[in-house]
Regions:
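N-terminal export signals
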Residues: 36-56
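Feature activates predominantly on carbohydrate-active enzymes
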Residues: 58-247, 251, 255-257, 261-264
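Substrate-binding cleft of secreted/luminal carbohydrate-active enzymes
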Residues: 323-384
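Substrate-binding cleft/loops of secretory-pathway carbohydrate-active enzymes
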Residues: 265, 269-301, 332-343
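Acidic (Asp/Glu)-rich catalytic clusters
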Residues: 124, 163-167, 210-214, 278-282, ...
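Active-site beta-loop-alpha junctions enriched in small/polar residues
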Residues: 71-73, 136-138, 177-181, 224-226, ...
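N-terminal secretory signal peptides
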Residues: 1-36
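C-terminal segment of N-terminal export signals and the immediately downstream linker at the start
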Residues: 22-31, 52-62
Length: 384
């Protein structure tokens, strides 16, 4: 069969290998013999079967994203406060206690300015270049001041902090999570989901935030974990599904993109609705799959964990741009392991960079935990 194909290729000067057309330049008069030609084609055949991005030397792209997700607002979870943490002045003895205390809704800002300042400088020092800021109800929005909690930043304060970040070489990116599991920051509007009033509020906030950030490259919309299992501790639980979920997602995307900004979301909807995700998710939306375990060997993973890791491969297969997300939320190995795995399976042209998400409040009790996350990214940058 190989001889037959070679005879055919010698007639036209081309060779079909798999589904790729390999053009072979050769000079019949200069060929020493037929055997040399066969060797050349065989070598080319092997090379053509290797993904081009694996053959290319991985080099650090100066524009590659090395991001940290930091919370200005931490009102992203429960709408009720456990009895242990009813005291608003509770003295947290550890980062874990600070996280548990800040996790339920608080009508005031759970944020420490000195901790924030230290983290920004640490990020710049290790070579990170982006801060994704979970804004929530921590800003006194002009369009909806009723959302702001006590001590929320003024617009002037926010602009000042954005300027400080840019001066440090850190690109600020806004995040408003519109998933119903994480929208308690919307206050009363979190109980008006998918109504006309709700759409008006979301439209106003997206537009105002984009203006405050001077038309950022990206706008993170969240959209993760909108399932009943993630709302078991909520008093008021709501889950959109089917066309309503997609319709609302398209609404948010439309509001972002009409201002010339690119939408960015968490990708875990695909864990449970893989076929629908790849059928309906626009390629214009930047994707962040996340997995916080230590095992990345698909042959040794069982479902559903295997699907969490494999989604990196699937997003690449379908041609989506990605910013894979790791964390020190569960262990100290995940972030660097995420970088090692994803740079092997994602084409550099679609690997926009990486994000760490510590999932801890920006409070003094969690400073060391945040610094550990930054150090892990710093090591990954050096090895990339």
């Amino acid at each position: 069969l190989l001889t037959k194909r070679l005879n055919e290729s010698m007639k036209c000067g081309t060779k079909i290998i798999g589904q790729k057309k390999l053009i072979i330049n050769y000079n019949f008069n200069q060929m020493s013999n037929r055997r040399n030609f066969i060797k050349q084609v065989a070598a080319a055949s092997v090379a053509s079967s290797i993904p081009s991005f694996l053959m290319a030397q991985q080099q650090s792209n100066p524009d590659r994203i090395w991001a940290n997700l930091l919370h200005l607002s931490y009102n992203m979870w429960e709408d009720t406060v456990p009895l242990k943490y009813k005291d608003e002045n509770y003295n947290c003895a550890s980062c874990q206690e600070a996280r548990e205390w800040a996790h339920p809704y608080r009508p005031f800002l759970t944020f420490d300015d000195p901790t924030w300042d230290v983290l920004l400088k640490e990020m710049a020092a290790v070579g990170m270049n982006m801060v994704i800021i979970d804004l929530g109800d921590a800003v006194q929005y002009e369009s909806h001041p009723e959302i702001a909690v006590k001590n929320a930043w003024t617009k002037k304060k926010l602009r000042s902090e954005l300027a400080k970040m840019r001066k440090l070489g850190l690109e600020p990116i806004p995040k408003l999570n519109f998933a119903t599991t994480h929208d308690i920051w919307l206050g009363e509007y979190s109980r008006m989901v998918s109504t006309k009033k709700y759409y008006d509020v979301c439209r106003n906030l997206i537009s105002e935030v984009i203006d405050l950030f001077n038309s950022p490259r990206f706008f993170h919309l969240g959209m993760d974990e909108e399932t009943p299992s993630y709302q078991q501790r909520f008093d008021y639980a709501i889950v959109r599904q089917n066309d309503l979920w997609w319709g609302d997602l398209y609404f948010y995307i439309g509001e972002v993109e009409k201002k010339g900004v690119r939408s960015w979301i968490w990708s875990d909807y695909a864990w449970h609705h893989r076929e629908l995700f790849f059928k309906k998710m626009p390629k214009s939306v930047l994707q962040s799959n996340w997995y916080y375990g230590t095992n990345f060997d698909l042959k040794k993973l069982d479902e559903p964990t295997k699907s969490y890791v494999k989604l990196y491969n699937d997003l690449e297969e379908y041609g989506y741009d990605q910013v894979p997300t790791g964390s020190n939320h569960s262990n100290e190995q995940n972030m660097e392991a995420t970088v090692d795995y994803c740079k092997k399976v994602i084409d550099p042209s679609r690997l926009y960079g990486f994000m760490t998400a510590p999932w801890r409040p920006t409070m003094a009790e969690c400073l060391d935990r945040h610094k550990e996350a930054i150090a892990q990214v710093g090591r990954a940058i050096k090895k990339f």
